Regions:
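Extracytoplasmic beta-strand/coil segments of soluble accessory domains associated
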Residues: 26, 45, 49, 77-121
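Short acidic/polar hinge/loop motifs at secondary-structure boundaries
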Residues: 121-150
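Gram-negative outer-membrane beta-barrel transporters
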Residues: 22-23, 605, 612-614, 631-717, ...
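Acidic/polar loop-and-plug regions of large Gram-negative outer-membrane beta-barrel proteins
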Residues: 237-239, 244-318, 347-391, 445-475, ...
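Transmembrane beta-barrel wall of Gram-negative outer-membrane proteins
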Residues: 178-180, 184-216, 220-289, 311-326, ...
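Structural signature of Gram-negative outer-membrane beta-barrels, strongest in the C-terminal barrel
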Residues: 397-399, 409, 413-425, 467, ...
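N-terminal periplasmic accessory domains that precede
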Residues: 76-79, 98-103, 113-116, 133-136, ...
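C-terminal beta-signal and adjacent terminal beta-strands/loops
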Residues: 616, 654, 707-715, 733-789
Length: 789
């Protein structure tokens, strides 16, 4: 599927979905709360006008733009740390996160997280290999708020996501001109400018435009810009008595370095970690200029050139529209978008733990001579070395989605909604995995050339190998779903809702065959003796799936300030491109149950949610260091309790807490049955005290967040234990008069060493006290000054 420009223009002008709340003045931020029961949410509701959180029979977290800033997020995925029940591993950088929801099993990426903009998914499959939804989105000052729905009725709406739906709602123009110019500076060469402007064009016509540009060297010294790029967005809104339509466009061009596990020292059965000599865990990285620009052979006489600084960036265009209007007794809502662009991965993927150079050479059964690729000179035999691969994944993606809904009041208090969801999407993939290099195990590693005494050449420009897994694939998918939902306010206290959905999916594609060859025909050049190449011949992927989902919910008001809710749903996850390529053709089936309590008043807000989910046919896939594509399938179950609350005992003091306790286990999963679901902590919580002052010239808010992440396992076998850790973030917001805003934040100010990932490519525990893990970034600070009008 390749759409012409005319299709993009049509998508931008077509009708689409959500009526959002107006942005609130910054000075009112202290009165805002992510758990305010009177807030109106539009995510997970059948009708465009939404529902108050106190009346909702599902779990949803909201955060305003200022609350997101106070969370000190390092990326889009990192912003999800404010959501209980969600665990986002964002130590890989600004993109390429692994996000997990309520114990739902996956090996990584974010198959159970859909990111929406104004109610439309950015890409219908929430995850493909080397691409998850949060990578496609950048937060800036054009965003009004974030809503995160967990479970609930989401299996029947939009793309049927059974996990978490993250909806970013854009600011729109209003009657009065409004905007801001924000300049940001920070540690590690951070520089950023954000611009937003909005206003009225004419009677009933409104506009907004904004974007950002940012460059930073990063907390980890890569010797090149770790993040560099920006985006530009615009909306045009027309309102009339019977409705409103908004069209929008967004272009993002951003490059982001990607970080994978590095060697660390592990003691006391993994409970104590420290930096590997020569490689600082908080600020160090193997990445550097020595192998930033490389040429990789892809076949006999063919090669590609790549820049490590391109990382896991995007060059993406989004065109969309939302429309809500009345026709007689009917309400019609539509969400539509068209997305096109590229999302490459150029990253260094590590494998086994370091060893001395002499030990590495001895593994070939011969003596040898080792020199640096750049600068020459002999390498000390005692130098610690490792092999790591320069993996290249090129993805060209395209999608069109449309979510059309018709609602009608059947009788007083009862509204029926019927809808159709349609998505057509494609991905064109070219992969070169492997390309291992012999590197020094130190900050900004250096490549090593190695020649054995018996004449064998181990490396070429430091490369010990070529691609062990090459892939050329071209995939197309189409999903059509019909759904029916009913909302019934039975009386003043009881509200019921339910819905059903039936979906058809058609996926087809072409995957080229591969062969393993010796590129130069010389057995003594070891570096290219086993090169995976793509062949002209190919095999077809062609599968149709159909499935049914349902949901039932109830909310009962106990008092004016408290209510309880219950929810049951049965959903599914249809196999995506990569699943079908690897032969995982089964539909995942998910049953979920929730029981919740909500209460709130001027002095407090409280949400408690108990949940249970059960999975069948859950696949696992990982590329191991030796090139093996390991796959298996099984079941799981998880239950837990989420808490989200705030207490305001006196004056401007607020004490906020979010957290989750989780018990998730594998079932019917080969030898892994009974193990803890990998990569997800049993406990995590965030405690945020803050204080707000009203000053003669404005207002000031200071805050801090203490976060604790519990033990996890990095692998299915539960042999790589990742110890618990904690972090401390701090910040302050100062508003001066009506126009000026100043903010200062610090992330991980105590410079803690915590791991978000082990090395799934090398199953097993630490070897000789050395462990491969991906640590969180060290401390960093940001300062911004904004002028608002």
């Amino acid at each position: 599927m390749r759409y012409a420009l005319s299709a993009a223009i049509a998508a931008a002008l077509a009708p689409g979905a959500v009526l959002a709340q107006d942005a609130q003045p910054a000075a009112a931020a202290a009165a805002d709360s992510a758990t305010t029961l009177d807030a109106v949410v539009v995510s997970g509701t059948a009708r465009f006008k939404g529902v108050r959180k106190r009346d909702a029979s599902f779990s949803i977290t909201t955060a305003s733009a200022e609350q997101l800033q106070e969370a000190v997020p390092l990326s889009t995925a990192d912003a999800l740390k404010v959501v209980p029940g969600v665990w986002a591993e964002s130590a890989g950088g600004s993109t390429g996160a692994n996000i997990f929801v309520r114990g739902m099993p996956s090996e990584g990426d974010a198959p159970f997280v859909t990111v929406q903009m104004d109610g439309a998914p950015l890409f219908p499959p929430p995850t493909l290999s080397f691409l998850e939804n949060s990578t496609l989105f950048r937060m800036d000052d054009t965003i009004e708020r974030m809503e995160v729905l967990r479970g609930g009725p989401s299996p029947i709406f939009s793309n049927g996501q059974p996990g978490a739906t993250v909806n970013f709602i854009q600011k729109k123009g209003g009657e009065e001109p409004a905007g801001s110019l924000r300049l940001g500076l920070g540690s590690d060469g951070f520089r950023r400018v954000d611009l937003f402007n909005s206003g009225k064009l004419g009677e009933g016509w409104y506009y907004s435009v904004g974007g950002f540009y940012r460059s930073t060297d990063g907390v980890r010294d890569t010797q090149f810009p770790a993040d560099k790029g920006g985006q530009l967005s615009a909306t045009l809104t027309h309102s009339w008595d019977a409705g409103e339509i908004t069209v929008y466009a967004r272009h993002t061009d951003d490059k982001n370095a990607f970080f994978t596990p590095i060697p660390l020292l592990s003691r006391d059965n993994g409970s104590s970690l420290s930096s590997f000599p020569g490689l600082n865990a908080q600020t160090g990285t193997l990445l550097g200029n020595d192998f930033r620009h490389v040429t990789i052979p892809t076949g006999r006489g063919t090669s590609i050139s790549r820049d490590l600084a391109d990382g896991r960036g995007i060059n993406l265009d989004v065109f969309g529209a939302s429309m809500d209007f009345y026709v007689g007794d009917w309400t019609i809502s539509d969400r539509v978008n068209f997305v096109t662009g590229s999302a490459p991965t150029n990253g260094l993927f590590t494998g086994a733990s370091p060893q001395t150079l002499s030990s590495f050479i001895a593994g070939y059964g011969s003596a040898g001579t080792a020199t640096y690729v750049n600068g020459g000179g002999a390498v000390d035999p005692n130098q610690q070395v490792l092999t790591a691969g320069f993996w290249v994944v090129d993805k060209e993606i395209e999608s069109f989605t449309n979510d059309l809904r018709f609602s009608k009041d059947l009788f007083e208090g009862n509204t029926l909604t019927a809808g159709v969801y349609f998505a057509k999407y494609s991905s064109k993939d070219t992969w070169y995995l492997g390309n291992n290099m012999l590197l020094t195990a130190q900050n900004n590693a250096r490549r090593i050339n190695l020649t054995l005494a018996d004449g064998r050449q181990v490396t070429r420009d430091g490369f010990t190998g070529t691609s062990f897994f090459s892939l050329r694939g071209d995939y197309d998918g189409q999903n059509t779903a019909v759904f029916l939902a009913d909302e019934w306010q039975v009386n003043e206290r009881l509200r019921l809702d339910g819905g059903i959905r039936y979906e058809w999916q058609q996926v087809d594609g072409t995957v080229h065959d591969t062969a393993t060859v010796d590129l130069d025909g010389n057995p003594n050049t070891l570096y290219d003796n086993a090169t995976s190449i793509s062949l002209p011949s190919s095999r077809r992927i062609d599968q149709d799936d159909k499935h049914f989902s349902w949901t039932l919910g109830a909310n009962y008001k106990l008092t004016d300030n408290a209510s309880v809710f219950a929810r049951a749903n049965s959903g599914y996850k249809l196999p995506a491109f990569d699943n079908l390529r690897d032969g995982n053709t089964k539909v995942q089936e998910i049953d979920q149950y929730e029981l919740g309590f909500k209460s709130g008043a001027q002095s407090y807000d409280l949400y408690l949610t108990a949940f249970y989910n059960k999975f069948t046919n859950s696949p696992f896939q990982a590329f191991l260091q030796d090139g093996t594509n390991f796959t298996t399938v099984g079941d799981s179950r998880a239950y837990g309790v989420e808490v989200e609350g705030a207490w305001r005992p006196v004056g401007g003091l607020e004490l906020a807490l979010t957290g989750v306790w989780l018990d998730a286990k594998y079932e019917n999963y080969r030898e892994f049955t009974g193990n803890q679901v990998m990569r997800q902590p049993k406990q995590q919580f965030r405690f945020t005290p803050s204080y707000y002052w009203t000053l003669p010239f404005g207002d000031l808010k200071v805050f801090a967040t203490y976060s604790r992440i519990g033990d996890r396992y990095a692998d299915l076998a539960n042999t790589q234990k990742l110890p618990s850790y904690h972090t401390l973030d701090v910040g302050a917001n100062l508003h001066v008069g009506e126009h000026w805003e100043f903010a200062a934040t610090g992330s991980n100010v105590s410079n803690e060493l915590g791991l978000t990932e082990g090395n799934v490519r090398v199953p097993g525990a630490a070897t000789g006290g050395v462990f491969m893990g991906r640590p969180i970034a060290g401390r960093s600070y940001l300062f911004s000054a904004a002028y608002k009008w």
